[in-house]
């Protein structure tokens, strides 16, 4: 058992949209990621995801059950759980620091593979 200094871990990388694993519990990865710009629309068929804002503000775009596009803004200290199967994309005009909780092995781009896909996130 050991403690993790989140600020120190965030200081070890600068890249955006590249989640880093900082812990694991009960088959879940705890990840840190920096957002800036627009991510790809995607969904996770089998995994829920929790996004906790540590610093900054971002918008979570998502499509509801009827396929209508919706959005919510999240600020420091707020979190959202994106249910499995929900199409979504984070958008950040300024750099945002986020902690993610998701099942180990969850692909960051879900059902979409491309330039933003990180198949094997680094542990830091």
Please report, for each region that a protein language model flagged, where it lies by residue.
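Ligand-binding loop in jelly-roll beta-barrel domains
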Residues: 84-114
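A short, N-terminal "cap"/entry segment at the start of jelly-roll beta-barrel domains
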Residues: 1-31, 113-124
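A cytosolic small-molecule/anion-sensing beta-strand core signal
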Residues: 26, 54-55, 75-76, 94
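Short, conserved beta-strand element in jelly-roll/cupin
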Residues: 34-35, 44-64, 101
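Short acidic-glycine-tyrosine-enriched beta hairpin
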Residues: 64-84
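Conserved short histidine dyad/triad with adjacent acidic residue
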Residues: 15, 29-45
């Amino acid at each position: 058992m050991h403690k993790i200094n989140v600020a120190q871990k965030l200081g070890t990388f600068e890249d955006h949209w590249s989640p880093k694993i900082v812990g694991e519990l009960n088959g879940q990865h705890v990840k840190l990621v920096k957002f800036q710009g627009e991510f790809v629309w995607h969904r996770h068929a089998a995994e829920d995801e929790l996004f906790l804002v540590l610093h900054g503000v971002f918008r979570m775009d998502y499509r509801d059950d009827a396929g209508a596009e919706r959005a919510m803004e999240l600020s420091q200290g707020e979190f959202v759980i994106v249910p499995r199967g929900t199409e979504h994309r984070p958008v950040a005009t300024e750099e945002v620091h986020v902690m993610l909780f998701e099942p180990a092995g969850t692909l960051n781009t879900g059902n979409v593979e491309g330039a933003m896909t990180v198949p094997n996130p680094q542990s830091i």
